[in-house]
């Protein structure tokens, strides 16, 4: 289905925070189910809730209560039963007993089954945290432990389950046996590429988080259930860690923190939720909310997989960690070896993603190369401009500091290349007169662009010259038998010729080719290099004259800059006052000029030739 986000490689996920009732698993399970039903209606296939959300995080020694732990199992069974007719895989937090140890766990519940349980690996016991008072670390499970039994919880029709007498009375109850460990990967068959891993709060804060290895093992979505009481500045720390994890892991990072309802005896809670994808924030909710909140976004699973293919070092890292170190032992645990992860398959029969038009829940930038945030845009412009300047400085120094020969038209690209060249000369301590700025009027050059070209070159202190190409172009067109040759001689269209034939692609390319030819010969004569002006948008579209034309130069400073960004770069140069006021006024005049190759004359009173009328808006071209 073309309009289905899932069929286009996306997966809808949610990070949820909601009010908890401390020490009341039944009430909390009911609240989770209510949210899960709403998320199912929204097409969500994976929903993460906060750490210990079935009991509340800040309940201290009540975590060790047998009554509470029994109520937790009953609440898990309630969630399991409710999940049978719900779409999303639910990831919820709860304390679970294994033998004589208690673990801080994340349970994955979906399709009427508890799919797996991931214990928290790293327990903070510093400052306001003292989790080792209650819990055992999940990175040190007893030898051979790979599953956990959940008394009173059913496994579903195809799960491992037995019955036992809970109190010796002879009455029996179901006991589900489910995978247990921090090395679980959950593969969603109906969403190609969606494999998720779960870690808990502090696991994100250690130098080598379990999620990093999970990503190397194939997880594309990394889930973190968090308690994380709020202190001043901690929200920024979470964002930094989630962003970093998603960027290094080439994955999505889904983060849900505890909020309303948690005890404020000595702690406070903000209920922050975040989803990052490959270092970019997809969504977040307000902090300190009144009531439940969910960050619901569509993760580009297909894009993440493609990025991993492009970045070969990602697979190299997984291979290195999975291989023995020379002279040392082979990796032995999940925490050193991505290959040690276990995969749990969620079949298409159990989780069938909607194949209907559910819209797209992610922000799509209209201008992908131009940030909306003014501060970020200014930073990008600063970096882009100085990258160009530094690169040109290096190139000039490496080839003996030749002069620069550049064709200036009064358009955006040649303007930007010229102000890059001017700054490069300043950095090198050379006079700007070593820049030979040559304008070459053709058959359609307007007075405005001709004036802007001269004002800019002279204002910058360049060596400015005019070389009119019309006579040479006319001679070439005449000698090759082009209709324009006879028209130029007689002023009358040749018999049978149309104006379209007169101003055809040959007419245009003769002018473009002559300009480039002159520039190269002038550079030869004066000991210079031709500085190319074509931008990334033109190169991507092939919107240039190939061979002897504007496709060719000795060095192209604009080749990595899209057209939509060049306009902002020039505005940034004006705003930063890098040049004097007269140059600034000329730059603003150039920005107000229609983008045109000026190769075909306008009819009397008609509009000038427009590039965007021919190839479409650059805003659209740069977007695609």
Question: Where on the chain are the PLM-derived regions?
Answer:
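Enzyme catalytic cores with a strong preference for nitrogen-chemistry domains
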Residues: 1-405, 423-432, 464
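ATP/NTP-dependent adenylation/nucleotidyl-transfer catalytic domains that generate, transfer
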Residues: 28, 161-166, 192-195, 249-251, ...
